């Protein structure tokens, strides 16, 4: 696993010393040696690598990584550029188009968002190939909860975008009045028509950032 560095390492270093993390590290290491696991080990912490703590303006919470070949690269909802765009991201792009008029790109790589301060964080950071939720309950939730708690304590406005019930369960940790919490159903085809479409998270986020003197996010994903 490519280790955390910089601000996130400083903020979360206490977690690495806890028994749950030592158990998690050993379990994940064994899984990578004996099974096909996604994302590639060096990409596990990409959400933290691409978006340093001091630069976080927006947090989008996902669940666990995509579990088919070549998809996951450590950013929730994002896929590598030559991979078919997954259905949930198709719906995110449709809402982005309806909300802000952004062109719908031909790829699903959201690195541009991450580099502008959008932390694309799954609550579980690894998964077995073709087995959704297979690494739930082995310790990742405790680790990512610690990251969410660090974000909650930041003394500056941050937007938390919570899509679907698992993400919305994290709301109990978000009690800092400086932050904005946006909730909607998950963009999955199973639930997008229950209120995800029309929720306008992207324009609401930018309005909040601008109202607080921060540069808005350029949500347009460019062709690569």
What does each of the following model-derived ranges do?
Residues 223:
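Ligand-binding clefts/hinges and TM-proximal coupling segments of bilobed small-molecule sensing domains
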């Amino acid at each position: 696993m490519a280790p955390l560095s910089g601000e996130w390492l400083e903020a979360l270093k206490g977690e690495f010393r806890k028994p749950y993390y030592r158990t998690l590290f050993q379990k994940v290491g064994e899984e990578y040696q004996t099974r096909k696991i996604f994302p590639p080990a060096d990409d596990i912490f990409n959400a933290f690598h691409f978006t340093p703590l001091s630069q976080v303006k927006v947090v989008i919470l996902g669940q666990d990584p995509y579990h088919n070949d070549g998809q996951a690269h450590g950013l929730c909802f994002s896929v590598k550029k030559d991979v078919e765009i997954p259905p949930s991201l198709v719906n995110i792009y449709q809402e982005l188009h309806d909300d802000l008029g952004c062109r719908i790109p031909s790829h699903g790589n959201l690195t541009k968002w991450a580099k502008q301060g959008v932390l694309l964080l799954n609550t579980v950071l690894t998964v077995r190939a073709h087995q959704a939720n297979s690494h739930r309950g082995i310790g990742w939730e405790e680790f990512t909860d610690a990251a969410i708690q660090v974000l909650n304590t930041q003394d500056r406005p941050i937007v938390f975008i919570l899509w679907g019930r698992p993400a919305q369960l994290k709301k109990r940790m978000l009690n800092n009045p400086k932050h904005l919490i946006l909730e909607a159903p998950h963009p999955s085809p199973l639930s997008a028509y229950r209120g995800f479409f029309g929720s306008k998270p992207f324009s609401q986020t930018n309005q909040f950032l601008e109202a607080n003197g921060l540069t808005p996010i350029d949500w347009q994903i460019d062709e690569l």
